[in-house]
Amino acid sequence: MGDVEKGKKIFVQKCAQCHTVEKGGKHKTGPNLHGLFGRKTGQAAGFSYTDANKNKGITWGEDTLMEYLENPKKYIPGTKMIFAGIKKKGERADLIAYLKKATNE
């Protein structure tokens, strides 16, 4: 598992412009990520997803996030997430460790 503190820095640098993680956090360009783990794609209440996200039908967890965060548009063709991805596996592991903690508090 990755390093939560390093993951928080990655989130602030690469994700926080479009996403929030706290319970009751607002949707921005991207959805609030609270409760992400164990939720199916395209299911955050009140966020307008593309059909690609709604129809992907996978459940978010460490393995699915590891693959998605490497190249979001390859994993879910048609997603409106414009982020290019994180190529370094260690950085993805750190981010996932942070998300696992932060989206569950």
Curated annotation (Swiss-Prot):
Heme c binds at C15, C18, H19, M81. The modification N6-acetyllysine is found at K73, K100. Induction: Induced by lipopolysaccharides. Pfam families: Cytochrom_C. Keywords: Acetylation, Apoptosis, Electron transport, Heme, Iron, Metal-binding, Mitochondrion, Phosphoprotein, Respiratory chain, Transport. One of its GO terms (biological process) is response to gravity. Belongs to the cytochrome c family. This is Cytochrome c, somatic. It comes from Rattus norvegicus.
